[in-house]
A protein has these predicted regions:
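Aromatic (tryptophan-biased) beta-strands that constitute blades/sheets of beta-rich domains
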Residues: 1, 30, 34-43, 81-87, ...
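Extracytoplasmic beta-rich repeat domains
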Residues: 1-13, 21-23, 40-54, 65-66, ...
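Short coil/turn segments that connect the beta-strands within blades of beta-propeller domains
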Residues: 14-16, 56-58, 98-99, 141-142
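Structural motif
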Residues: 23-30, 67-73, 108-113, 152-159
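C-terminal hydrophobic structural anchor segments
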Residues: 83-121
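Blade-level signature of beta-propeller repeat domains, shared across WD40, Kelch, NHL, RCC1
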Residues: 108, 128-163
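Short, composition-biased motifs enriched in small/polar/acidic residues
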Residues: 160-194
Length: 194
């Protein structure tokens, strides 16, 4: 795009490329040798930094500029149409695992939500960091790592999450992690040297 900031990585979907920036249209394009063809183009998803995630035929991302955006949105990748919009989550970065969205808001709230095109359904939320958070949560070794712009890094021990009545369970299925998410809970923070 011709925007002043083109920081969001291109997203691959079904052999096509989704390009977006915070001030211009998002566009799904098909590469044809040395030419391209636009599949759809609209303003339904305009991402500043974090690229978001594709699950099946749906894309989940944070729409808007990082300083003032507050919308997480699901769009249909075949049509570009909006499936749902969730306001009041300050410009977020998103990762996904086991059919769940792991969303870190700009102000340090971590959300766990269903990855469903039908609706936004929050499963858990906890304040995990202070300061400005722009980097996506990272999953590794049964933990979620989150970081703020000051360089503070936290390791969230998902297997030790305190929940009533059931704890979070994490299982390995071959090389794949499977999570059993609670309806609510408090994340245990373990500081790591950054």
């Amino acid at each position: 795009t011709s925007a002043s900031v083109n920081a969001a990585d291109p997203v691959l979907y079904d052999g096509k490329i989704f390009l977006t920036s915070n001030t211009r249209d998002g566009e799904l394009i098909e590469l044809r040798g040395t030419s391209t063809r636009s599949i759809w183009k609209n303003r339904n998803m305009r991402i500043h930094f974090n690229a978001g995630v594709v699950i099946g035929d749906y894309f989940y991302g944070a729409d808007g500029r990082v300083e003032r955006g507050n919308t997480v949105r699901c769009i249909n990748m075949k049509t570009g149409e909006t499936e749902w919009t969730k306001s009041s989550i300050p410009c977020a970065s998103i990762t996904a695992a086991d059919g769940k969205l792991i969303i870190l808001s700009r102000n340090g709230d971590l959300y766990i939500a269903e990855a469903s095109p039908a609706r936004f359904k929050q499963l858990a939320r906890s304040k995990v960091l202070s300061g400005t958070c722009w980097t996506p949560p990272v999953l590794a070794n049964r933990s979620v790592y989150v970081r703020n712009s000051r360089g503070t890094l936290y390791k969230l021990q998902m297997s030790e999450m305190v929940v009533e009545p059931q704890p979070l369970t994490v299982n390995f299925a071959g090389s794949r992690l499977e999570f059993s998410w609670p309806a609510k809970g408090n994340f245990i923070l373990e500081s790591t040297d950054a």
